[in-house]
From Swiss-Prot:
Organism of this sequence: Desulfotalea psychrophila (strain LSv54 / DSM 12343)
Keyword Membrane carried by entry: no
Domain Guanylate kinase-like: 4-183
An annotated GO cellular component: cytosol
Reaction(s) catalysed (UniProt annotation): GMP + ATP = GDP + ADP
Function: Essential for recycling GMP and indirectly, cGMP.
Keywords of this entry: ATP-binding, Cytoplasm, Kinase, Nucleotide-binding, Transferase
UniProt entry tagged with the keyword Lipoprotein: no
UniProt name for this protein: Guanylate kinase
Family designation: Belongs to the guanylate kinase family.
InterPro entries: GK/Ca_channel_bsu (IPR008145), Guanylate_kin-like_dom (IPR008144), Guanylate_kinase (IPR017665), Guanylate_kinase_CS (IPR020590), P-loop_NTPase (IPR027417)
Length: 203
């Protein structure tokens, strides 16, 4: 069985990544979302085990020390990590996996080179648009918004390390671009847009 492909997607907070991923995940088959662990508080509407695995900091650090995470990072005063076992199990079954992780976590994966992946960065048109989106979201304090904006400039520069850059100035277009990238990468690994292996007849 062909192994699945890993898609690593990063963006500054407020760039629209979650909305874009929601649209794409609903329309692309054989594509699973890897649910990260985090120590941050759940936002309104978020569900444990669906959006994130919400854990206490001491539990996260214990998991970190046991080597449970494929990557982990401390971002915006909270810990985030990706379960190694969960990702590898899905890839071994031929299912493509999406990792929604920050630039720190993505850089760890890039530098380790332990797992082939396609890296995609989603950016806002500019930082003023990003700040406007963060304020409209209404879930962050003024201190948190300033922290996220302070980190955003550096995150945008890191987009140069990624294989693809999507600028989200139009939600529908950005969603279509992400879907097209996934289909193109599947074709490179001899899969149909639906993610199924292509059977070639050799005479």
């Amino acid at each position: 069985m062909n192994k699945g492909k890993l898609f690593v997607i990063s963006a500054p907070s407020g760039a629209g990544k979650t909305t874009i991923l929601g649209r794409v995940m609903a329309n692309v088959g054989r594509l699973n979302f890897s649910i990260s662990h985090t120590t941050r508080t759940a936002r309104p509407g978020e569900q444990d085990g669906v959006d994130y695995h919400f854990v206490e900091q001491e539990d996260f650090i214990e998991m970190q020390e046991k080597g449970i995470f494929l990557e982990s990072a401390y971002v915006h005063k909270n810990y985030y990590g990706t379960s190694r076992e969960a990702v590898m199990a899905q890839l071994s079954e031929g299912v493509d996996v999406v990792l929604d992780i920050d630039v720190q976590g993505a850089t760890i994966l890039m530098e380790s080179a332990s797992l082939p992946a396609t890296y995609i960065f989603i950016a806002p048109p500019d930082l003023s648009v990003l700040e406007e989106r963060l304020r409209k979201r209404g879930s962050d304090s003024e201190e948190t918004i300033k922290l996220r904006m302070g980190n955003a400039a550096g995150e945008m520069l890191s987009s140069r390390k990624y294989d693809y850059l999507i600028v989200n100035d139009d939600l529908a277009q950005a969603s279509t671009l992400l879907k097209s990238i996934i289909w193109a990468e599947r074709a490179k690994s001899r899969r149909t847009p639906a993610g199924l292996p292509i059977k070639l007849v050799v005479e």
